[in-house]
Amino acid sequence: MSYQHSSFDCTSANFEKAALSHFRTLVAFLPDNCRVYRQTWEFSTVLCLDFLACLEGLAITRQNCAHLVNVTQELGLGQAIILKVGNKIIEWHRLS
């Protein structure tokens, strides 16, 4: 039996987009122009938060890092979180 879901697209890219959107709603202090994406590093997936376009949001995000870790783990978005400004890594948090 074949099921067709015309109301939504079940691709991994769309699933990731929805998960990152949900992440943003749960982390309300994150600036809108902070770039949020996932990257593969060897055998791990890392959640990257790039503050190049919103340096003012980095301080409040660093203060709320425990919340970032909890939400990232809850949604299964990665094994680590990187806070960065462009290509420069500011903080790296490995999730347990």
Model-derived features with residue positions:
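Short, aliphatic-rich beta-strand segments
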Residues: 45-52
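Short amphipathic beta-strand starts and helix->beta connectors
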Residues: 28-36
